[in-house]
């Protein structure tokens, strides 16, 4: 039996270039408001929506995220997207996680600005199938 069976895990993805207090506030609110067991921060490896030429290298962004989440025992950093060779599409990441941890309930956390064009994402229906979608409204914090 896997150690995440039946657990509620929040997923907060992004370029995190850099990670900032807003990301941490969104994660804390989701953790508290939805009684999550953990929130996993997932830095994008090859983001479909960003020009990577000016971005900080993925391993450095992962290091920044790891340092930022270290004080919080319920925050974790995952390199699942950085380790992947393909473009970091959310539906692929959630599919991988759901295959690894089939009994875990995932909560995908996104900002309200992303909701405006969520229907343009690659396979939003798979995202909704693999996770509960939480939308963070900025004026909440």
Task: Describe each PLM feature range.
Residues 1-141:
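Nucleotidyltransferase catalytic core that binds NTPs
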């Amino acid at each position: 039996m896997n150690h995440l069976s039946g657990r509620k895990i929040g997923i907060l993805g992004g370029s995190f270039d850099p990670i900032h207090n807003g990301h941490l506030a969104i994660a804390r609110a989701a953790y508290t408001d939805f009684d999550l067991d953990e929130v996993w921060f997932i830095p994008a490896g090859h983001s479909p929506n960003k020009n990577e030429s000016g971005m900080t290298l993925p391993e450095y962004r992962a290091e920044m995220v790891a340092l930022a989440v270290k004080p919080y025992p319920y925050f974790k950093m995952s390199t699942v997207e950085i380790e992947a060779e393909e473009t970091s599409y959310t539906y692929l990441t959630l599919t991988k996680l759901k295959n690894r941890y089939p009994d875990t309930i995932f909560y995908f956390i996104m900002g309200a600005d992303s909701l405006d064009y969520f229907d343009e994402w690659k396979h939003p229906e798979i995202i909704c199938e693999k996770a509960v979608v939480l939308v963070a409204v900025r004026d909440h914090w």
